[in-house]
Amino acid sequence: MHKVTKFAIRHLSDKASRFVPKAGVYPKGYAVGGIHCGVKKDGKSLDLAILQNTFGKNASAAGVFTVNKFKAAPVQVSKKILKEKSGLGINSFVINSGNANAVTGTQGMRDAEDMVLVTDSVLDNPTNSSLVMSTGVIGNNLPIDKILGGIPKLASQHLGNTHQHWIDCATAICTTDTFPKLVTKRFSIGDDTYTLAGLCKGAGMICPNMATLLGFFVTDAPVTPSALQQILKYAVDRSFNSISVDGDMSTNDTIVAMANGAAGGEVIDNTSSCAERYSRLQTEIVGFAQQLAQLVVRDGEGATKFITIRVKDALSYKDAKSIASSIANSSLFKTAMYGKDANWGRILCAIGYANVTSANSVIPEKTSVKFVPVDGSDHLNLLVNGEPEQVDEERASEILQNEDLIVEVNLGTNGGQNADFWTCDLSHEYVTINGDYRS
C-alpha cells in the first residue's frame, strides 16, 4: 500500500490535505485498492484502481453517464454491460487515470472491453461482471499492455478493506485533483445498520447535466437494481449535477453505485410496501452525494473560494436550479468572487438570462439578493424587492475574504421551491494548470 504524500497525486497542498480523512467506516463485503501501472508519466503516481464485491452474492448496480456526444469508449462499454445485465451481477469496477480512452476509435473500444475481460478473469467473475472507467487526456490510445499487466498484480496483491486500501483506490483515480476524495458513513434503517463509502475524482471539466466526473458509491445495504438506479439518479441531480467548476462537461463522466446486501435485512425496492425504507435510504444517499460532490468544488482547479448559490421561493425546482446554475457558471461572477469584488450586477445578469419555464419565473420587482456569511454574522443585502441597497463596501470586502460564502437569491414568487448549487471562483491558477495539462 502507498501512503498519501504530496507526491502521490498532482499538486497535493497543505490546504487541501485537511480534507483527506484519517480514518473511516467501510461497508462489509468489499475489497479495493490502487497501484501505479505505468499510465502516468512520472513513474510513481497511482493510476489503476479496482473496487470488488467479495460478499459471494451478486450485487446490484446502477449508473448515470455523461450526455457529451463524444462518449468515451469505457462509457459506452459500461452502459452496454449495465443495460444487458439489468443492473444485477455487476461485481467490480476497474478504473485507470492519466488517459481518458476518449475519441480513440475501434482500438479504444477493444481496450475498454479487454479491461473488463481481464478484470473478470482475475477476480473469477462471470463474463461482463465489471464496469470500466477511464479519466485523463482525451485523444490518445491507452498503454493497454501496462494496464492489462497491472490488473492481475492489483487484484492479487493490493486489494483489501482497510482505510489505506480505500485511500489508495481514491488516489488512483485522480488527475489534476489536489487530494483524494473519500467519504464514509454509517446509518440505520429501522433495526438494520448499513454503511456507505463514496469516492470520486474531479477538479476541472465540471459542469452539470450528468454526469460531471467519476464517482463511486458502494453500500452493504440490500437494494434492488431498479431502486438503486432510481435513487442514484435522484441523488445525482441534487448533488453532482448541482456543481460547477469551469462549465466544461467531460466525455468520460460517470457515477456508479453498487449494493451487495452483506449487512442483511429486508431488501429495499421501489414498491409501495417498501416506501419508508426506500425514502430513508434515498435521504441518506442524497446527503452523502452532496457531501462528496462539494469536495470536488473545494478542489476546483485554482479555486480559492467555495460558494453556495441558494435560490429560494421559485415557481418550480427546475427554475430554482436553472437560476442557481446560471449564476454558478458565470465567468464574470466567478472572477469577481476571486477578486473579492461585490459586483452584484453580475449576479442579476445571470439570473436574467437563466433558462426558466415561464415569464413569471423571474419578476425583477420581487427579486432579492444577499451575501450570507457562514460564520453566523449578519448578512449583507444587495438587492431587496428589486431595489438596490446602499452596499457597505467594507463589510462586503470582509465577507469576501472568507473561503466559504453563500449567495442567496429570493425570487418572491410564492412558489416555495428551493435549490442549492455549489461552485468556486475562477483564478489565474486555473489557466496555469490547464495551459500545461498534457506536459
UniProtKB/Swiss-Prot annotation:
Keyword match Metal-binding: no
Compartments (UniProt record): Mitochondrion matrix
Sites annotated Cleavage: A211, T212
Residues that coordinate or bind substrate: T175, K201, T212, E301, N434, S439
Catalytic activity: N(2)-acetyl-L-ornithine + L-glutamate = N-acetyl-L-glutamate + L-ornithine; L-glutamate + acetyl-CoA = N-acetyl-L-glutamate + CoA + H(+)
SUPFAM superfamilies the UniProt entry points to: DmpA/ArgJ-like
Enzyme active site: T212
GO molecular function: glutamate N-acetyltransferase activity; L-glutamate N-acetyltransferase activity
Documented EC number(s): 2.3.1.35, 2.3.1.1
UniProtKB keywords: Acyltransferase, Amino-acid biosynthesis, Arginine biosynthesis, Autocatalytic cleavage, Mitochondrion, Multifunctional enzyme, Transferase
Main localization, broad class: mitochondrion
Cellular component annotations (GO), alphabetically ordered: mitochondrial matrix
Associated pathway: Amino-acid biosynthesis; L-arginine biosynthesis; L-ornithine and N-acetyl-L-glutamate from L-glutamate and N(2)-acetyl-L-ornithine (cyclic): step 1/1; Amino-acid biosynthesis; L-arginine biosynthesis; N(2)-acetyl-L-ornithine from L-glutamate: step 1/4
Chain positions of site Involved in the stabilization of negative charge on the oxyanion by the formation of the oxyanion hole: T135, G136
InterPro entries with a match to the protein in the record: Arg_biosynth_ArgJ, ArgJ-like_dom_sf, ArgJ_beta_C
Changes after translation: The alpha and beta chains are autoproteolytically processed from a single precursor protein within the mitochondrion.
NCBIfam families: ArgJ (TIGR00120), PRK05388.1 (NF003802)
Family: Belongs to the ArgJ family.
More about this protein: This protein may be expected to contain an N-terminal transit peptide but none has been predicted.
Protein purpose: Catalyzes two activities which are involved in the cyclic version of arginine biosynthesis: the synthesis of acetylglutamate from glutamate and acetyl-CoA, and of ornithine by transacetylation between acetylornithine and glutamate.
Name used for this protein in its record: Arginine biosynthesis bifunctional protein ArgJ, mitochondrial
Gene source species: Candida dubliniensis (strain CD36 / ATCC MYA-646 / CBS 7987 / NCPF 3949 / NRRL Y-17841)
